[in-house]
């Protein structure tokens, strides 16, 4: 099957998920993106796990039904297989989509569906969370039926539709394409949340084409770069820093990010997983970079090899202006902090603070 066909089928899947959320009354609501992103992530994790399982145990690739072959596998052998699958989110047998699909007509299916998502997060709890600036952890897999108002029949029907949406095809043929495929798909996934007409993501997203150009300017293809750190202090959905990581080589660098938005941080986690960068998940921080910069070495702010950023240009930060003036890290705001205007505080030049933070965070 050609990559173009897989790409179109993936876009069709995203459209089906959006249709399902719209039909249940979640269209253009705050919960729409949660359902779409989490369900898409679940589908990706399922297919990625199967892809890696076949590579780990070649006999699975020859099985008439790989899911039945996995179900017959003794638990001890299944666990050994999972241990050998590096940089892959582990799924138990009962987490796989066909297992849920077989039970979709049960009276408590919504409860089962939600429990599966939470169990996946629990199984991978060491990496499957967003860390807040105050050290609290936020799971990126949450119960989805809870966003639906109504009784159990309505919730069951909604979760059944989601399973039906994701069960019709496989991502497997796309994994070899890697970044070139999934960067395009990610852009399509969030396009409805990247508009000024009612969307909330315009400030969080940099187009893939621009991100790629910036990455190529920073790292020449002839350079042999290894074991470096990449940082984005206003990461949004991660397009800039992931393009940079791809230019360097995903396994040759570690990504560090911070962003004040919980929504964009969730999207960033998905973006890292899609692009085989699960090793950087624990460095995704949700919080105010200027007021509470998180990444440190000892008592000092960490310095990074590469930094990319598309920070907000003008924003009202009068509420924590005094905190920045009394900044603990002496010399971070070496050029000063813009004054609070008498009028139009929304026009405060916050980009000047971010620019100084960038320079302070860059290795000599």
Walk through the language-model features, giving the residues of each.
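A short, mixed-charge helix-start or loop-turn motif at secondary-structure junctions
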Residues: 196, 254, 337-341
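Amphipathic alpha-helical transducer elements in NTP-driven molecular machines
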Residues: 7, 11, 262-266, 301-305, ...
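Non-catalytic, mostly N-terminal accessory regions of nucleic-acid modification and defense proteins
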Residues: 1-213, 218, 286
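Mobile active-site "lid"/loop adjacent to the S-adenosyl-L-methionine
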Residues: 313-353
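Alpha-helix initiation/capping motif
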Residues: 155, 174-175, 203, 257, ...
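Conserved S-adenosyl-L-methionine
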Residues: 200-309, 314-327
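Conserved Class I SAM-dependent methyltransferase catalytic core
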Residues: 13, 29-38, 44, 214, ...
């Amino acid at each position: 099957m050609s990559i173009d066909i897989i790409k179109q089928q993936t876009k069709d899947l995203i459209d089906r998920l959006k249709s399902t959320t719209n039909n249940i009354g979640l269209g253009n609501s705050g919960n729409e993106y949660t359902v779409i992103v989490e369900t898409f992530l679940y589908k990706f994790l399922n297919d990625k796990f199967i892809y890696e399982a076949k590579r780990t145990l070649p006999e699975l690739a020859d099985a008439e039904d790989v899911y039945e072959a996995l179900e017959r596998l003794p638990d001890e052998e299944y666990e050994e297989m999972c241990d050998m699958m590096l940089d892959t989110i582990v799924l138990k047998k009962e987490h796989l989509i066909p297992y849920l699909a077989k039970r979709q007509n049960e009276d408590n299916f919504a409860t089962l569906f939600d429990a599966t998502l939470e169990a996946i997060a629990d199984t991978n709890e060491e990496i499957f969370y967003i860390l807040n600036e105050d050290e609290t952890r936020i799971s990126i897999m949450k119960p989805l039926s809870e966003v639906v108002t109504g009784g159990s029949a309505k919730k069951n029907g909604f979760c059944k539709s989601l399973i039906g949406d994701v069960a019709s095809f496989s991502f497997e043929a796309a994994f070899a394409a890697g970044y070139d495929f999934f960067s395009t798909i990610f852009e399509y996934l969030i396009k409805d949340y990247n508009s000024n007409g009612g969307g909330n993501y315009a400030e969080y997203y940099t187009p893939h084409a621009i991100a790629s150009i910036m990455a190529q300017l920073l790292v020449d293809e002839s350079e042999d770069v290894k074991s470096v750190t990449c940082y984005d202090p206003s990461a949004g959905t991660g397009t800039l820093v992931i393009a940079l990581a791809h230019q360097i080589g995903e396994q040759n660098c570690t990504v560090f990010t911070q962003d004040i938005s919980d929504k964009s941080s969730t999207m960033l986690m998905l973006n890292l997983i899609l692009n085989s960068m699960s090793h950087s998940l624990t460095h995704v921080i949700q919080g105010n970079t200027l007021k509470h910069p998180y990444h440190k070495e000892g008592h000092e702010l960490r310095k990074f090899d590469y930094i990319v950023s598309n920070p907000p240009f003008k924003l009202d930060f009068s509420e924590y202006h005094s905190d920045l003036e009394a900044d603990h890290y002496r010399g971070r705001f070496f050029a000063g902090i813009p004054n609070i205007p008498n009028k139009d505080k929304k026009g405060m030049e916050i980009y000047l603070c971010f620019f100084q933070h960038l320079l302070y965070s860059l290795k000599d």
